[in-house]
Structure formats: structure tokens, C-alpha cells
Amino acid sequence: MTMLKDPSQKYRPFTPIALPDRTWPDKVIDRAPIWLSTDLRDGNQSLIEPMDAEKKMRFFKCLVAVGLKEIEVGFPSASQTDFDFVRELIEGGHIPDDVTIQVLTQARDDLIERTFESLKGAKRAIVHYYNACAPSFRKIVFNQDKAGVKAIAVAAGKTIKRLAAAQPDTQWGFEYSPEVFSSTETDFAVEVCNAVIEVFQPTPANKLILNLPATVECATPNNYADQIEWFGRHVDRRDSVLISVHTHNDRGTGVAASELAVMAGADRVEGCLFGNGERTGNVCLVTLALNLYTQGVDPQLDFSDIDAVRKVVEDCNQIPVHPRHPYAGDLVHTAFSGSHQDAIRKGFAQQKDDAVWEVPYLPIDPADIGRDYEAVIRVNSQSGKGGITFLLEQEYGISLPRRMQIEFSQVVQRETDRLGLEMTAAQIYQLLESEYLQASAPYALKGHRLQEENGTSAVDVEVISAGESHHWRGIGKGPLEALVAGLPVAVEIMDYSEHAIGAGTNAKAAAYIELRVNGGRALHGIGIDENLTTASFRALFSALNRALSQAESRAA
């Protein structure tokens, strides 16, 4: 089957609402909306392998550290794992006093009751329920007319209100979503939401959240903004409701749709870090927040160490962040074009520390989000980096991790600039040796003893420094953690990988590590040895020595 020459035979254009007096195009976003992360619910349910309890807790703590005050933590009536996770959050005291958890439930009494069971003992919680209102869902999925759909929303609301009253020690919030709002007749969405408002009787001091999802993105963002503004004009008790938006990215405009919706009156935005979520994903909260930041608006979220946040998200979701993802991708602050690099260099030369940011091609100062400038001003091209990686793999069996490829390409570029010549594979390998494998000062690893018992590793390493022998001892859950515990400086391991070089009895292990010393910038190290543990230790000392040497050079 091929694409139709006349797609109008199969597809119909979106029918916009009439709003000739729209006001949103003249609005400016001058403050952050209320943010809600649905990474642990919408994001988690879209993963090939949903997160286990350990990953969910790690992700939750990351969201709290970033500054999220509302976090949708699961769908407890649909998953025992989610139910148990909600209980652990509450019983384990993991929820800060200024953070409110939210859970999702369908509009069914048995599921609502199970949801309230999961929330027993919570200080504050939002119960979020939904039912689909769009014509296609009414006709195809549920075989319900408009009256039936509205009755479901009202009945479920009454059940939620009754069960909440039975648990008065919890400070309750309520959220209703007319699912697939973007494809629903807007006047009918208002009718259903007004009926829900009558159930909950919200006040300006105790507002009801009305979440208007673009469950499937079906039109240009301006149409969604029109729907939001029209809804805000016609919904009852506007001063007693929070209009929330939840955009997906089916047409690739989820960020724009959310931003225009806020201009149109939305108070609150739901999304995921780096845009995870069903199909093409939810709107990316990182992009939205940093878009505000680069307009001089405090986003109320902290991405000062964006790579650490990205590491948690990638580990938990098992999905890499695209190299071109706004703000967070490996390549977003890198210019390969010579003319771009020239403009960036001139911009840095003229940029004053306390001046308005005006460096060409860079909408944000990379340092604000924990990035350094080396990748920005490197002169190596993409093909050059790819060639370096290819030669090392083909000639020496060395497969550098992605971020290390970028770091080492800068080393190669500096050498080619110095020599003014093309470097051979042997010369590139010699440079790799001198930069990483021979990095033995100020600390040279002479040997180590490792004892492992009941999942605990104890290590004793002998180190030569300034001609004198020292012994460092540490204990941890594995050899590397034990070694880090014994170091005289603070080391944070950002990434670690390993592979075999060769096969059979002559095989060696190659270990790669990315770490930070004393909170400094991330650097890499390599270790190669017949023994994997030794290779990993050599990699750590390689990176450690490089970091300390560079810090000493900068201080000088």
C-alpha cells in the first residue's frame, strides 16, 4: 500500500471553532504555570519494560530534586506495582511536605475505591479521573450517547467526593479530564465539566482541576489555543477551577501547543522530562521550562545539572535522549560549520559575565545547565569524529562511548591543528594512550586486593604518589563503589561501560568511565587489562588523574 495521491479521500481536516475575537495571540508568558510530571504514570505506561520499584523511587527523587511540586505517581487501581509504590511513598515518608502526589483512575466505582485504598495516610493527594468524550470514542469504543458520557463523569465524581469525605485527614485535590478533549465538541466538553463542577462545588480557595488533554494531537497548535480560550470563557466558576493542559506530540508540535495554551489561559501543564509518553510522547517539561528561562522568566524548575537529570531519565526509561533534543542533547551546543564556529568564538570574546546573553547560535549559556564550552568551540567536524571512532574500532577494537567520542575528538583536533597534518590510525591510538592510558599523575595505581562477601566488596589499593607508596581502603556494593569510597577526593561516577578486545585466551577487557571530581566537569578515562576489575580501576585512575591535572593547570 502506498500514500494516496488524494489523501482527502481518506482523511478529513480538523474543523476549527469560531473565535474571531481571540485574545491569546497578544498575550506573553511572564510567569511559570503549575507543573505536573506524569513520568511515573503516562511515561511509565508507555515503556516497553515499565519501571520497577527501585527505578520509580530513583525517578521520584530526581523529580523532587528538580523542583516538581505535583507528581503523578501511578495508576494504583490498574497495577499492583503502582499500588505498592504509592504505599511505599506514603508509609516510607518519602514525600516532602511541599510535594503533592497525584494518582489516576478510570471512572469506575471499584477502581476508585481501590485508588483511595492506596492513598490511606497521605497528607495531600490529588485524585485524577477521566472518561473519553470525543465522538469517535462515544460511537466506536463505548457505544454511549452524550448523556451517558456525562452521567459517567458525574457518578464517578460523586463516588470520589464520598470516599474523600471518609478520609478527612488527607488534604484532597480533585482533577477531571474529558479525555481526547482536542477531538471533542468544545461546547460538549464544557457541558460535561460544568456537571462535574456541580458535584465538587469548588471555591477560589479549593479549586478543581479541569485537565483538557490533546490526547491525540490533531491540528495546528493555534486551534488548540482557541479551544482553551473558548473553554475558559464558557466554563462555570472560572475563578474556582484550574485549567490544565496535557499535550501529546503526534504532529510534532506538543511544546508549541502547550505554550499557546498557557497564553490562552491555561494555569497548569502536565508532561514528562524529555518528552516520554505514549506514541510520540508527552510534551517535554525540560523544553518548556528552559524556553521560559531563555525568555528571562523563572521556570520554578532547576536544571542546573541537566546531564545528571538526563542520566536518571535514560537509566529509568531505557530510552536515550536524542543528540538533537533541545537543550539536553549531546550535540545541541555544538557547531560543525566553520562560519558558525567563527560567530560563536566572536560572541564569546565579546560576552561579559554580567551582560545580557548574546552569543550567536546559542540560545542559552551552556554553563547555566551544567555544560562546559569545550564542545561548543571545537573545530572537528562530524565526519572527523566518525572517522576517528571508525579507525579505533577497526584497527584496535576500541569502541569509545558516545560522549567520550566527542571528548577525544577535541584532543585529536588540537593535535591536527598543531601538526597541520592528517593523523593516521597509529597516531590516533598513540594520542589515546598518552591522553588516557598513560595518565598516571598524581596517582599511579600499583596494585590492589579485593575481597567480596555477601554482596559487599572491600578493596585495598596501593598507589604511588610523588615517589611514595600509599594504601587506600574502601567498602561498597561492588569493586568500583568500594574504590570510590576509599579515594581522598569526592568522585561521582556518571557513566561506565566495558567490552572485550579480541577473543579467547588472548582477550583483554576495555573499561570506560565518566566521572566528576569535587563537583567539577565530567571527564573520561580508559583502562585496558586482562582482568576486568583491574581494567575498571585503571579507567577510574585515568579519569581521576586527568581531572586533577586539568584542575591544577586551570588553577595555575
Curated annotation (Swiss-Prot):
InterPro entries, A to Z: 2-isopropylmalate_synth_dimer, AIPM/Hcit_synth_CS, Aldolase_TIM, IPM_Synthase, LeuA-like_post-cat, LeuA_allosteric_dom_sf, LeuA_N_DRE-TIM, PYR_CT
What SMART domains would the database entry show? LeuA_dimer (SM00917)
Reactions accelerated catalytically: 3-methyl-2-oxobutanoate + acetyl-CoA + H2O = (2S)-2-isopropylmalate + CoA + H(+)
Locate the Pyruvate carboxyltransferase domain: which residues? 33-307
Positions of disulphide bridges: none
Q: Give the record's pathway.
A: Amino-acid biosynthesis; L-leucine biosynthesis; L-leucine from 3-methyl-2-oxobutanoate: step 1/4
Gene Ontology MF: a single term: 2-isopropylmalate synthase activity
UniProt family annotation:
Belongs to the alpha-IPM synthase/homocitrate synthase family. LeuA type 2 subfamily.
Q: How does it assemble?
A: Homodimer.
Spell out the protein name for this chain: 2-isopropylmalate synthase
